[in-house]
A protein has these predicted regions:
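A short beta-loop-alpha structural element at the N-terminal edge
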Residues: 5-20, 72-73
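Hydrophobic alpha-helical core bundles mediating ligand binding, dimerization, or RNAP-core interactions
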Residues: 19-26, 40-44
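A short gly/proline-enriched turn/hairpin at secondary-structure junctions
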Residues: 28-34
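Active-site rim helix/loop that mediates acceptor-substrate recognition in acyltransferases
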Residues: 34-55, 59-61, 69, 115-117
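Short coil/loop residues immediately preceding or within conserved phosphate-binding loops
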Residues: 53, 123, 128
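Conserved beta-strand in the GNAT
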Residues: 57, 63-72, 127, 132
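Conserved acyl-donor/pantetheine-binding loop and adjacent beta-alpha core of acyl/acetyltransferases
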Residues: 75-125
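Conserved acetyl-CoA-binding loop-helix of GNAT-fold acetyltransferases
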Residues: 130-133, 139-148
Length: 148
């Protein structure tokens, strides 16, 4: 059976499916309860959306299966709707001890990334803010389609 694959812009109704793609891609359920894993995926996607100027969604048979978010550093500004979504998602994660612990871990990882980037001695004009594809759709060339 051949899949119907389409690349398109992000729609608000895509967000829950894309949060699930992130949750599966990074195996959040292996180190968090299902409830916290869902909240963490929501925070991660919301944070990435604050850091992008380009979005493309891979839709397979009408279902969001993956995404790529890019950032042109010179043109970037954070849309208020994405910042508010990020704040709301963070508040949802901060209400539990488990959520606070996981956020602290990721804060440390982010600090390491920042230090490594400073040591690079090169200014980049852009970056890939997020690139994820649901595991069940890998190997079909969808990632290449998103990247190109």
């Amino acid at each position: 059976m051949e899949n119907n694959i389409k690349l398109r812009e992000l729609k608000k109704q895509d967000l829950p499916a894309l949060e699930n793609v992130i949750r599966k891609t990074w195996d959040y359920d292996k180190f968090a309860t299902p409830k916290t894993a869902r909240k963490l995926a929501k925070v991660y996607l919301a944070t990435c959306l604050t850091n992008q100027t380009y979005t493309r969604i891979a839709e397979v048979d009408g279902v969001p299966a993956g995404l790529i978010l890019g950032k042109n550093i010179e043109k970037h500004h954070c849309p208020l709707k994405y910042r508010l979504r990020q704040i709301s998602a963070l508040c949802g994660l901060l209400i539990s001890k488990e959520g606070r612990g996981i956020l602290n871990f990721y804060k440390n990882v982010d600090e390491i990334y920042s230090q490594l980037l400073k040591q690079c001695d090169k200014d980049y004009r852009g970056e890939i803010a997020l690139f994820a594809l649901s595991p069940e759709y890998r190997g079909l060339g969808i990632g290449k389609m998103l990247f190109h």
